[in-house]
Amino acid sequence: MPTPCPPACLSTPGTHRLLPFPDWKAPSWESRKEATCNSSSPGPWAEPTVQGYHPTRRLRAWGGLAGGATFMVIWFFWLWGSAPGSAPVPQSTLTILIWHWPFTNRPPELPGDTCTRYGMASCRLSANRSLLASADAVVFHHRELQTRQSLLPLDQRPHGQPWVWASMESPSNTHGLHRFRGIFNWVLSYRRDSDIFVPYGRLEPLSGPTSPLPAKSRMAAWVISNFQERQQRAKLYRQLAPHLQVDVFGRASGRPLCANCLLPTLARYRFYLAFENSQHRDYITEKFWRNALAAGAVPVALGPPRATYEAFVPPDAFVHVDDFSSARELAVFLVSMNESRYRGFFAWRDRLRVRLLGDWRERFCTICARYPYLPRSQVYEDLESWFQA
């Protein structure tokens, strides 16, 4: 909890800014016991007097009064400015320019209150490239840079303007980073050490009643659109299939699910194979957050180490493949699980709920929340090495 700010300072994020006057002490005329004018023993350093008049003492008294009055005036204005109902200090609106909207040539409507909907005021998103010279930050999504569908306006870049590299893909599916040495100042990604950290989801405190757990009629499900035998998830599925009933959906299986069908379908399953397409640092996607937790199925996680998942969810909210020595051992554990043990995986639902963070507008609005705290002089000289680590 931040240290309370005393009346002699103004609170700013992460620091205290002193007002332009020294620390106040009690005036000398309050703290000093005055000597009488007709003292019979003035002492060797007594002030010269004329008929009981002490000029130096009188000046000191007036100086103390003036200092005290100055302090009271400044303190009054400080209290008046911070009183309830007083006019707030206006904050300038930040403009975040999205150079190319992710995965589309048609950006969504971006009204002025877009970021207000996500709890961030004084923040404006725009896809209008004519604002390049005045934007407070410019965001470049990597996929369009990778395919050269979008090019960097290096010759038009205003001096000192922060540029943001954005990507929610894994390093295995991110190429061409060597072309961007010494260009970007900040990174927006799912990595926890990113300048703008935007996970695919998170758990938040539950504000209403707990929703009932959907009835289960099937064992395990998996939605896969891009099946490649060389991937670890494909190999693990091949090893599990002889021991575990897995219903496979998605384009790769010829059984695609419509957007409105996805969660109701997966809710009927006890387990969901939340297998990431590649295993990288902090790479936990909608497969875990949406297809499993939000649908009401227990995630069977293949991705980063268990400790990474436990940074986001309780340790008893999921099954991790690393906890088992073989696919067969994992399958036996899932099939033989009794009802009491199974329901224990949902204990978190009594106090928490899933918040999905898949909207790019919300992700970009997060830049404004982080903006005051990010170093302007920072540059990623070797973005590829950082992201591939």
UniProtKB/Swiss-Prot annotation:
Query: Which cysteine pairs make disulfide bonds?
Result: 115-123, 258-261, 365-368
Membrane-topology annotation of the record? Single-pass type II membrane protein
What Gene Ontology molecular function terms does this protein carry?
4-galactosyl-N-acetylglucosaminide 3-alpha-L-fucosyltransferase activity; alpha-(1->3)-fucosyltransferase activity; fucosyltransferase activity
What's noted about post-translational modification? N-glycosylated.
Q: State its Enzyme Commission number(s).
A: 2.4.1.-
| Function, in words | Catalyzes the transfer of L-fucose, from a guanosine diphosphate-beta-L-fucose, to the N-acetyl glucosamine (GlcNAc) of a distal alpha2,3 sialylated lactosamine unit of a glycoprotein or a glycolipid-linked sialopolylactosamines chain through an alpha-1,3 glycosidic linkage and participates in the final fucosylation step in the biosynthesis of the sialyl Lewis X (sLe(x)), a carbohydrate involved in cell and matrix adhesion during leukocyte trafficking and fertilization.
What is the designated name of this protein? Alpha-(1,3)-fucosyltransferase 7
